[in-house]
Amino acid sequence: MITKLFINNYKGFDKTFIPIENVNFLVGDNSTGKSTVMDLLYLIDHNHNPFIFKFNQDSKMGNFFDMVNRYSDDKSYFSFACEKKIDDKRCFFKWKFTNDNGAASVVEYQSTANNKTIILSKKKNDNVELYTRATEDDFRLWIEHSTSDYFEDTDEKSENGLLFDLMVGDKTLFPKVLSQKDMLRFSPVRAQAKPYYDSYERDFVPEGDHIAFFLKSCFDKRNGKTNSIIETLNQFGQESSLFEGVEVESYSGSGSSSPFSLDLKYGKVKINISNVGYGVSQVMPLIVEMLRRKKTQIAIPQPEVHLHPKAQCAFGTLVFKNWRDNANSYLLETHSEYMINRFRYEMHHAEKKPKGEAQVLFFERTEGGNVITVMPIGKNGRFNCEIPDSYGDFFVDEELKMLDL
């Protein structure tokens, strides 16, 4: 899991250090950098090759000039770095990009390996110079010492040679980070519910289409784990007043390929999921994925979309309990104070506390660019910091906007 992020000269950020805890609520106005941070964390987490970043594959991040900091006087480069925990060890990684005919191209890559930092610097002849330097234990200090002033030994390889090292797994140049993916990320708008589904196995997709098939498998193969998932899902439905229970109905036979429907129970009445409120179809994939996973980082933009306040509170409760019981971690981009406050309430009253930390990352836009205020949430549910006045103003403004509806 990525535990720290550094962004320099990228989008609206300049030399910004961001801690990443087990539970992170990303809060702030539009265009303050929340999606930028979530996109960047996902991009780094799913990177396969240190010299190739696909900025426009999963998210449309634009060309070099879209990404370089428009507030900066120096628009020739941008960089980002991270601290990642791998097998209980902290590893550091850093990339620097310049303009290549409008595309963002890696010109320098640094990472820790074997108690040293290796630096790969790309040259105009497509060769890559290899440097080493001592490695600091502190991420911030490591970033400060990542300039050429601290480089030591040097060697030169062709880019093809380095790519060969990557393919054969030279651990001194390309550590395990390139094959270890920890994050699942949902899209801001989940798939619309269907009147019926064709049952076949499907892997995770950001829109949540796969959830119906997983739920059917839970009903087909009842055991302790699947019963727990179904019971917790029904409990959430009752606490949120969204539904009282979930059932699966097969249309022809009981085979794995039979079409089926997802029905929601309201007392003695069953209603097809496609005929209930839109908020149910938006939150159902989130809940099921949270319940089926353990020790997974889950990124969710706008989990509260189309949910009334009671359901937003129930979701805050579920996030807390799922973190505690399943050891999942969260990146939640949200405008819901109901969700955050219910999470803090659960933290305050829980006898069994989760392992790890939680925080609010409050994003603001200033004349000099985007800034982030880190607001740790203590084990007593209270903020362990001075709360900015603008944080309270943000939620008041959100409430005032609702008066226009």
Task: Locate the predicted segments by residue.
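Extended helical coiled-coil dimerization/tether regions that scaffold
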Residues: 169-275
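Switch/communication elements of ASCE P-loop NTPase nucleotide-binding domains
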Residues: 1-70, 83-85, 226-232, 242-405
